[in-house]
Amino acid sequence: VKEFVYHGGGFIGVGEPAAHQWQGKFFQLDDILGVEEERGFNLNTDKYNWDEHRDHFILADSEGKVDFGEGKKNIFALPETKILIQNNQEVQMAVKTFGKGRGVYISGLPYSFKNSRILYRAVLWSASAEEELHCWYSTNYNVEVHAYVKNGKFCVVNNTYEPQDTVVYKGDGSSFELHMEANEIKWYQI
């Protein structure tokens, strides 16, 4: 995993990824994720990295509070880590570069439309593929775009019981505004 990420890959860890107390560390991939859990073995470690960076690509279109579910307690950031969200000096979301690759740590991620969007953006960021965001994409996280390129069709789905407005981006990056009724599905030719 470390070699993959170091050479340009991405890794997303949720909760306690690769966690096993060994050689003074609990998170064995702490050099990729940039976080460690305080378990009484690293009390001598300086923990001064608490500044939040909520303007990050991963959080760009998620307003308000992020739901981490139960999340994890006692998580702190290593010095070169960028904390996206922390709560009472417990890291909830952080990012770190490792060699040519990137790692993302999320303390918990229960399913919701908003969290689905956050995970999607985390996948793009960790893969260094931010420029692919506006490809088969909806600006409203309650609305999804599904492309069936081989069949020459795509559909737009309103996942809610309420009308929604969005901007839909097609595979070529072109876009159009769309109003959808509750639970509506609209089909289009590519």
Give the location of each predicted region.
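A conserved amphipathic helix/loop scaffold
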Residues: 1-190
